[in-house]
Amino acid sequence: MAQNTADTLIHLIAGGSAGTVGAVVTCPLEVVKTRLQSSTAFMTPSRLAENAGGGPANGGQSELLRPEQRRKLSTTILRNRSQPQVIGGVRRIMAISHCGISSTTPKSMSIVQCLRHIVQNEGPRALFKGLGPNLVGVAPSRAIYFCTYSQTKNTLNSLGFVERDSPLVHIMSAASAGFVSSTATNPIWFVKTRMQLDYNSKVQMTVRQCIERVYAQGGVAAFYKGITASYFGICETMVHFVIYEFIKSKLLEQRNQRHTDTKGSRDFLEFMMAGAVSKTIASCIAYPHEVARTRLREEGNKYNSFWQTLHTVWKEEGRAGLYRGLATQLVRQIPNTAIMMATYEAVVYVLTRRFNNKSNEFYDF
């Protein structure tokens, strides 16, 4: 097998396997993160009291409102200011973000509350909503990303107009990989997000139904809603890989000093930690684009563009709104990245020994 073909196949199998394992294990946290990023993650005081041990306030009826329900509620409040404080079973004190009306600061679900709410109202299977499109998207996304990153990095190093393996090389490689991968797989992630925001507990929407519904609403262009936010998210991948490559180079120096030719559990643990640390820092820096992307993929016409969405969220919900779901993102991202990097390095190590007989080297992206 030709060297280039073997390398491409290694990237494909390793990236797909790593992404798949990480996606399956952390899918429940991914669903919670998407729900918290959404504009529907508000709770009424009665629900908060129930979670605190006060019991159900309205017979156990769900008080998690969709955007259209909050808009309807806000209209009712405006027309009936003299009416009692309980309208349609929901207290007026609840923040109504879609009309910019708030009697108090919006209350958002915690991770545990959101998990409990999903299981109680939609069943345990709802924790894996969107897993199908996620798995379909993971393999090609990782394959495209790592192959593009590797090819761009090799090309830049061979051209010689920038210093080999410098931060600039890593930044340009990550930017190219992020752009190509985001453009190619945005429709898949769009469908996944829509399915995770489906609150129907009785009949879960299938992938085909979701695709048909989105296409009927906006055609092919609808599947690329939020692509601008994804492009802004490329800065996260650049920060991630610059930090990761730096940590990796230091680990390689230490490994060379140990004069060992084979990888052990310590090596894979170090890669897990390097991936988790670099991704955590990158996520904290670039997180608002995730919230904007999720809002743009919601049904409705309130959020139209990337900057308009950021401005609306900032105006109605403040800084907290731009970072809503960050805790869940980090809780999910750390184990996901650790699992993904460990799986990736393990598969690459095994396949590299099998195809290229390079067991005495760290495999270079």
Swiss-Prot record:
Disruption phenotype: Larval lethal at the third instar stage. Third-instar larva are decreased in size and display reduced locomotion activity. In third stage larvae body wall preparations, mitochondria are abnormally shaped, disorganized and have a significantly higher density. Oxygen consumption rate (i.e. mitochondrial respiration) is also significantly lower than the controls. GO terms for biological process: cellular respiration; deoxynucleotide transport; locomotion; mitochondrial genome maintenance; mitochondrial transcription; mitochondrion distribution; mitochondrion organization; pyrimidine nucleotide import into mitochondrion. The keyword Transferase does not apply. The keyword Repressor does not apply. Pfam families: Mito_carr (PF00153). GO terms for molecular function: pyrimidine nucleotide transmembrane transporter activity. Belongs to the mitochondrial carrier (TC 2.A.29) family. Mitochondrial transporter that imports purine and pyrimidine nucleotides into the mitochondria. Essential for maintaining mitochondrial structure and function. Appears to be important for mitochondrial gene transcription and mitochondrial respiration. PANTHER family: MITOCHONDRIAL CARRIER PROTEIN RIM2. This is Mitochondrial carrier protein Rim2. It comes from Drosophila melanogaster.
